[in-house]
Regions:
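Conserved phosphate-donor/acceptor-positioning beta-strand/loop module used by diverse small-molecule
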Residues: 154-156, 165-190
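Hydrophobic anchor at the beta1->P-loop junction of P-loop NTPases
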Residues: 50
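Pre-Walker A (Motif I) flank of P-loop NTPase domains
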Residues: 44-47
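A conserved segment at the C-terminal end of the G1
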Residues: 59-72
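A short acidic, amphipathic alpha-helical/loop segment
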Residues: 161-168, 277
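P-loop (Walker A) phosphate-binding loop of NTP-binding proteins
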Residues: 53
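PAPS-dependent sulfotransferases, especially Golgi type II membrane carbohydrate sulfotransferases
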Residues: 1-41, 196-322
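PAPS-dependent sulfation machinery
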Residues: 77-152, 216, 220-225
């Protein structure tokens, strides 16, 4: 996005500002391409939805599962026409795009064929709680374009929609990654600083992130839960508190939903037996025994010990789920 030329930025801005463009293309897409699609088949497939607090390994997990070549996901090449992947498949405005290190500067590269969290835009455009059939149609059209039967989504906002998604796709699997609370909180704080600088220097990136519903960090940051004790985002305690609020909430909701929801420990992904356990849960063959690069960085020495102890106890609870 930071390397888009003027024409690319104008086209994206038009789609960002005038929702009627993508909405109209979607209606045409359905008229032409939804024929001969069986939505019942899509509804009952074992799709996978990855959703958690950012910096928990969601993208690494997405790429790991996607390499299995069994799933369809929206990709960077589908931007900005993500409502009409079949209809606009011949439009290529991002030629000569070589793999680049993503703005997070976290050793993860992306290309036009990299999967990414773009279904948030569609879900934000509809009253999704009453639109099960519409989302099934949307996913069906993506599956048609990529000639796959199962959909793979990484969207950190989907945690708040798990009940809707379970109702829409009753056989779907949900992965909620988590990470050592101090390491994850430090990473969140560092990315907030990083993206605040990027947003200040490049307003197009800010508009792009707002369009995609990426409000995790930067100038457009929105807390996942209302802060109780800590309000300063430059204080590690703000992020630890958000970590505790986030995982406490979803642990209480889904820790007993063991057939459909699984909390995934980032640090354990280096263990091949843990990968095999994940493969069994997803009922798929994750044959690529990826060597995960689990990073640990020095953390601030000063933090709220009571808050941190609460976080560690919750981390252990999540780890002990079978």
């Amino acid at each position: 996005m930071q390397n888009y030329n003027v024409i690319q930025k104008i086209l994206h801005d038009l789609c960002f500002k005038f929702k009627i463009i993508n909405n109209s293309l979607y209606e045409i897409e359905k008229l032409i391409y939804f024929r001969n699609i069986n939505p019942i088949d899509t509804k009952h497939q074992k799709h996978i939805f990855i959703s958690g607090l950012p910096r928990s390994g969601t993208t690494t997990l997405l790429n790991y599962i996607y390499q299995n070549d069994e799933f369809a996901s929206l990709k960077y090449k589908n931007m900005p026409f993500i409502f009409s992947v079949n209809l606009t498949s011949k439009i290529n405005i991002q030629k000569n795009f070589k793999p680049k290190l993503r703005p997070h500067n976290d050793k993860i590269f992306f290309s036009l064929d990299s999967p990414e969290a773009f279904d948030e835009v569609f879900l934000n455009s509809i009253n999704y709680e009453n639109s099960e059939e519409e989302f099934i149609k949307y996913v069906s059209l993506i599956l048609k374009y990529y000639k796959k039967k199962k959909y793979l989504s990484k969207n950190n906002n989907n945690c708040k929609r798990i009940d809707f998604l379970k109702k829409t796709f009753p056989n779907a699997k949900f992965l909620i990654p988590f990470r050592n609370p101090l390491q994850q909180s430090l990473s969140l704080m560092n990315q907030d600083i990083n993206f605040s600088k990027i947003h200040s220097n490049d307003k197009f990136v800010l508009r792009y992130m707002n369009f995609l519903g990426h409000n995790e960090f930067g100038i457009n940051h929105k807390p996942w839960f209302k802060p109780k004790l800590y309000y300063d985002r430059n204080d590690i305690n703000y992020w630890i508190e958000q970590w505790v609020e986030f995982y406490s909430y979803y642990f209480n909701l889904y820790n007993k939903e063991k057939q459909s929801c699984k909390f995934i420990c980032y640090e354990k992904l280096i263990d091949t037996s843990y990968q095999e356990e994940l493969s069994k849960f997803l009922e798929t063959n994750l044959s690529n025994k990826k060597q995960f690069d689990i990073s640990f960085k020095p953390h601030p020495k000063k933090y709220d010990n009571d808050l941190f102890q609460t976080a560690i106890e919750l981390y252990e609870k999540l780890n002990n789920l079978i």
